[in-house]
């Protein structure tokens, strides 16, 4: 039998120890106690942070949302069918980050920033945190530049400025998404980058939005973040924050961006689902107590930031430029009930709302914007000069028309002044109608508003107002292209432009019969 020399054994062990490559990882590890409905309870994670990424076997990740005395409640990001009780769970020491940058433009990604459009991987290296603190008051600048939506009813009566939060609210199927998509289409030549976040939508609806943006040449400067109805509640809850981070990339570098959240009602429902599964106490309408904070911390990130902020953020690479992120959140109401919990929350957070009404939509007034209830709290300062000058009487005319129309139903004979006011209101209502996917330029809009404001529609039949407007715009773009170009570039209103518009409309009406 061979004798083992103790000194040889110690030399072999010493050699093995020297060759051993140990990269130490101080990682806190726990055990999965239960898995149900995308919620995982973990025992033994002592040093985990709120919102920290937790790694499970097989490359599955979760996010810690409940830090309890004896366990941690985490939500799984993605499929959870491979997870089982007794598996290990490790802290990563990282918070959730998503890819950002111009490489994402023209792409469709999920809530975690993974491409889902079949166009290959993203060629970017930059990532940023999903949850970020909004810029402080010192770094903000007042809103004084417009975001043209291309809709007469919005740009004339409820103007939106760069850095504003303007809520689009209304019942289902009355054109909320159409309004937002048209606003994105109108930005294709404005230099504003767009982000469209689809939350809880049907995949066919998202595919249709992508196709429409592509057809209208707006997909190239748009990022689409899709968390469809088939995705887990966790991804629907995270999608708006991911989209906001992608939009902030442009804002922080002195660019302008527009983000649409379609819609935040579904995000609130997803968050309610997560909270109830985490056994958090329910409040009004079974929503958790922090549902207001859910939306306020998201919408406060939309802002206009100062030159100093951009310069500080870019370490002096960009100077003298302000950045902005404009938000158009969408909220779906039930039977026009704007006093429900989530609608009132978002109304109080935003800088105004565009209220779409079912009755108007069903009577053929599209976009179905109710000018009486809709308001823009800060957009007036950002409105283009010519639009501001010409749209003053439009809102008043519509409000008075609504009031008079209600009384006129009961009165058989009306005096001349009331009848004229009613007819003017009807013509303005007709003028505010607009087809989908046909946003208007500033010059086209100014021309229509000028015709209404200066009484050029008085002798036009109410049913022919739309045809008159189209023919007039076509005539001006053909015969007065210089004037239209000047309005589009400068947006000013002076005596020269006033005289040019007046002479042009008079000449147009002299050659046509309406």
Swiss-Prot record:
UniProt catalytic activity: ATP + H2O + 4 H(+)(in) = ADP + phosphate + 5 H(+)(out)
Enzyme category, top tier: translocase
Principal localisation: membrane
Topology in the lipid bilayer: Peripheral membrane protein
Localization (cell): Cell inner membrane
Residues the record lists as binding ATP: 170-177
Residues with site note (Required for activity): 374
Record's keyword annotation contains Acetylation: no
Keyword entries, A-Z: ATP synthesis, ATP-binding, Cell inner membrane, Cell membrane, CF(1), Hydrogen ion transport, Ion transport, Membrane, Nucleotide-binding, Translocase, Transport
Listed EC numbers: 7.1.2.2
GO CC list: plasma membrane; proton-transporting ATP synthase complex
GO molecular function: ADP binding; ATP binding; proton-transporting ATP synthase activity, rotational mechanism
Family annotation (Pfam families): ATP-synt_ab, ATP-synt_ab_C, ATP-synt_ab_N
Function: Produces ATP from ADP in the presence of a proton gradient across the membrane. The alpha chain is a regulatory subunit.
Record note on quaternary structure: F-type ATPases have 2 components, CF(1) - the catalytic core - and CF(0) - the membrane proton channel. CF(1) has five subunits: alpha(3), beta(3), gamma(1), delta(1), epsilon(1). CF(0) has three main subunits: a(1), b(2) and c(9-12). The alpha and beta chains form an alternating ring which encloses part of the gamma chain. CF(1) is attached to CF(0) by a central stalk formed by the gamma and epsilon chains, while a peripheral stalk is formed by the delta and b chains.
Family, similarity comment: Belongs to the ATPase alpha/beta chains family.
Name of protein: ATP synthase subunit alpha
Gene (name only): atpA
